[in-house]
Curated annotation (Swiss-Prot):
PANTHER family: BIOTIN SYNTHASE (PTHR22976), BIOTIN SYNTHASE, MITOCHONDRIAL (PTHR22976:SF2). This is Biotin synthase. Binds 1 [4Fe-4S] cluster. The cluster is coordinated with 3 cysteines and an exchangeable S-adenosyl-L-methionine. It comes from the Bacteria. [2Fe-2S] cluster binds at residues 101, 132, 192, 264. The lineage of its organism: Bacteria, Pseudomonadati, Pseudomonadota, Gammaproteobacteria, Alteromonadales. It holds the Pfam family BATS.
Amino acid sequence: MINNTEIRQNWTVAEVDQLFEMPFMDLVFQAQTTHRANFPLNEVQVSTLLSIKTGACPEDCKYCPQSARYNTGLAKEQLIEVAKVVKAAKEAKATGSTRFCMGAAWKNPKQRDMPYLLDMIKEVRALGLESCMTLGMLDNNQAEQLSNAGLDYYNHNLDTSPEYYDKIITTRTYQDRLDTLENVRNSGMKVCSGGIVGLGEAGSDRSGLLVQLANLPQQPESVPINKLVKVKGTPLENADDLDDFTFIKTIAIARLLMPKSHVRLSAGRDDMNEQTQALCFMAGANSIFYGCKLLTTANPDENSDTRLFEKLGINKEAINFSPSEAEKKVDAAIVRFNEKDELFFDATSKA
């Protein structure tokens, strides 16, 4: 039995391969035991994810419909106004989200983007929501700017194992990703980092991904586990389906290796039935994205999730929020930013 409160950062792929070989029921039982030793019972953290700049990404991630290299029918969209971000954040809070995540399809943000991003962070924080961004690679200076503006979390996934990585992405290295995570951590922000399974990887690659995450100098506070969403036009549109039990085992092992991290049941939920999702929660998942879309891919709507939570007796993580003060700030912000046309620009243009 694994010590269910100890944090280890010296895991080996061989050890994790052995965990994948455990009987399913035994593994899930251990994962649930670990979860109960570290988190409140029957409580799930709820986040909302908004695409603040969609499409035309120069990267070649083979799973991604936002890459400019693939014909997926996705239209390029401008960086959206700060006021629209604030409006979406208010709606997210009203439906029970405690964290608001903003994603931009960039290899990395440019300095000209930063003032708009910093305003978004400040306005979301004024609502009493935790804030998170995923913008691509960050240098030290950019990480410091985001941190100083109050950004709570920064997401930058490792995607897969180091050994399989160049089969999926060639436009940035694995070390680039690790360097960004180091810059985020050094700035004082919390780290959100996970990966995708079902990319055609071997079992040892799933083990390798989890080992990389668990053995970081400090384990991520949030670990999203994504199941590939196959999108027509991407190189992985015809990838073989990943067995649901393998996916659930991946969740369980993430919980065992990172006992104090939130493990997020992320992309791919729209294709999962309620029973599969319930087993993921049993295996230690305690975070989801709420809302009918994750950037550009489908996600269960809020009503479906609410019904599932009621069936399972799951509660949403509470919001510590004083509405009167924040609501006034947000309402004023919407008026203020609507009056500033310069806060809307095409971040993908070369001008």
